């Protein structure tokens, strides 16, 4: 069965293909299509944004669509950047700009107050509009410098204390086993067959 992942983010596409592919699903993404809806993320939560995207794309394509909304919540910043994680430094800014702004905002924050979590809300929608939405998290803290080259987004700053490594220092399989997206996919997997009626 085909599932379309509603993203053009190559990093996310790779993670979804690895995880859903092993379950036997044919995974496509918006990178495989010339046209697709551009959903405005007007939700105030990760779950609301994920559902907006999956419902609109499922109606457009006539197939099951999986979308995510994910980001970083930093406790010392009252949960920011939150749903604005991708545009923390402004519209069309790079990961480097977002990471630089995060380090700037936390410059005077000691290590014990730099707790944070990655959050991923996944929403799988049928063309009928019915959705299945789950949430996964990965706890950690924000480091003082970027380390690692394997990830994307805030991964080089996100330290996992139990491993003493950043998310960007992990291999894809190591990250998938503990990541917020991996946790959300495990929850989704448990309900996927029933939801899709297979």
Curated annotation (Swiss-Prot):
Active site location: 69
Superkingdom, natural source: Bacteria
Biological process annotations from GO: nucleotide metabolic process; purine nucleoside triphosphate catabolic process
Binding site for Mg(2+): 40, 69
Keyword Nucleotide-binding: yes
GO cellular component: cytosol
One GO MF term: nucleotide binding
Residues holding substrate: 7-12, 70, 152-155, 175, 180-181
Pfam families: Ham1p_like (PF01725)
Cofactor(s) demanded: Mg(2+)
Family recorded in the similarity comment: Belongs to the HAM1 NTPase family.
Protein name: dITP/XTP pyrophosphatase
Species lineage: Bacteria, Bacillati, Bacillota, Bacilli, Bacillales
């Amino acid at each position: 069965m085909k599932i379309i992942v509603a993203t053009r983010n190559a990093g996310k596409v790779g993670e979804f293909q690895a995880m859903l592919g092993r379950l036997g699903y044919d995974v496509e993404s918006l990178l495989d299509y010339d046209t697709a809806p551009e959903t405005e993320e007007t939700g105030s939560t990760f779950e609301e944004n994920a559902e907006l995207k999956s419902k609109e794309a499922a109606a457009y394509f006539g197939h099951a669509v999986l979308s995510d909304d994910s980001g970083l919540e930093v406790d010392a910043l009252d949960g920011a950047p939150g749903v604005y994680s991708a545009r923390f430094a402004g519209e069309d800014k790079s990961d480097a700009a977002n990471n630089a702004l995060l380090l700037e905002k936390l410059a005077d924050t000691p290590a014990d107050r730099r707790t944070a979590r990655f959050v991923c809300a996944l929403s799988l929608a049928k063309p009928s509009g019915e959705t299945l939405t789950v949430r996964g998290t990965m706890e950690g803290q924000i480091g003082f410098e970027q380390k690692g080259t394997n990830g994307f987004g805030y991964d080089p700053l996100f330290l996992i204390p139990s491993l003493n490594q950043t998310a960007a220092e992990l291999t894809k399989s190591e990250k998938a086993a503990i990541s917020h997206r991996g946790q959300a996919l495990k929850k989704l997997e448990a309900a996927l067959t029933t939801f899709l009626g297979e």
